[in-house]
């Protein structure tokens, strides 16, 4: 009799757990089916004065203050559902940006990523123009592999033997909507050839 009572209790507990689990799954599904009524997307566009070549020796040989800059670019705040109500809480406050590097030649060494603070507000449905954005500084240009291209260091990449290093730069902006949601652009990519 005790065994049957234990089995009945186990069935009751299992049934109750199954009911709670079913309710939880159905609740989650209902939540994920809702439409986003106020999301935004950041994008980078309209590059002007984008450098395609840079001489490390000419610009960095006699100074530690050398930079590669993009003349100007635009960060856009796109409303994902323009038919839904929107507000100033969808404005994005830009906090920082990051540039990462990837070799486009046979080499494997790359500069350290550049991470810098950046301030500005991109209004919902609007743009923010950024002028003279630094995409490489002394930390990238005066260390390997780009420092190999300085004439004082031989003027060629020690890894490949080439006088040119071709890099892809990937630029990402990070920010928050005024309502507190984290937002980032997809990486905007472009290439630069570095020589001695």
Where are these regions (language model features)?
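Non-catalytic macromolecular-recognition regions in eukaryotic signaling proteins
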Residues: 28-196
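Sec-dependent bacterial lipoprotein signal peptides
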Residues: 1-26
